[in-house]
């Protein structure tokens, strides 16, 4: 029986998880077909190095944090992506962020390499590719959890544990999204599947049933 660990903390950037302990030894990474082979190569190199050094979870948290910052901080993203801004300034900004966040040295070296090779514009895609490879290596199913209000950590943990049973995945990673249109309850989306336990979903199902019944009576 898989033991469910506690939900990930702030550095997970709004992503909760139930994780299994990683297997010892280096794991094989198979890169899925993507548009940018350069992004693939940077992500693959980092994920393999982190796994080899036994720092995969820590580096994954770092990359998750970088991806979150790029999405949520428009000014930072604009500065990083701007080809006119000098490399030294970009390196200094990233160094400050890395120090405050407590990034692993492997992550810092990776960011510096991207500055040196003028590849910072690929950061979002590299982060996506890293996430894909990480999930592949750790048998992690990523699921989007949409709810009308923010769910408590314990609620998220229980949902993740249930999904673990339904999917058979060793690990489940929830990405919470607030959607006030749901009224109450939540919707979980993973792969091509969806579990709708929202009030809006219930209303729509009732309305659909009533429509069918009325149509049947009139026909």
UniProtKB/Swiss-Prot annotation:
Keyword terms: ATP synthesis, CF(1), Chloroplast, Hydrogen ion transport, Ion transport, Membrane, Plastid, Thylakoid, Transit peptide, Transport
Subcellular compartments: Plastid, Chloroplast thylakoid membrane
GO molecular function: proton-transporting ATP synthase activity, rotational mechanism
UniProt function note: F(1)F(0) ATP synthase produces ATP from ADP in the presence of a proton or sodium gradient. F-type ATPases consist of two structural domains, F(1) containing the extramembraneous catalytic core and F(0) containing the membrane proton channel, linked together by a central stalk and a peripheral stalk. During catalysis, ATP synthesis in the catalytic domain of F(1) is coupled via a rotary mechanism of the central stalk subunits to proton translocation. This protein seems to be part of the stalk that links CF(0) to CF(1). It either transmits conformational changes from CF(0) into CF(1) or is implicated in proton conduction.
Record-linked HAMAP family: ATP_synth_delta_bact
Extra information: In plastids the F-type ATPase is also known as CF(1)CF(0).
Subunit organization: F-type ATPases have 2 components, F(1) - the catalytic core - and F(0) - the membrane proton channel. F(1) has five subunits: alpha(3), beta(3), gamma(1), delta(1), epsilon(1). F(0) has four main subunits: a(1), b(1), b'(1) and c(10-14). The alpha and beta chains form an alternating ring which encloses part of the gamma chain. F(1) is attached to F(0) by a central stalk formed by the gamma and epsilon chains, while a peripheral stalk is formed by the delta, b and b' chains.
Name of the protein described by the UniProt record: ATP synthase delta chain, chloroplastic
Taxonomy of the source species: Eukaryota, Viridiplantae, Chlorophyta, core chlorophytes, Chlorophyceae
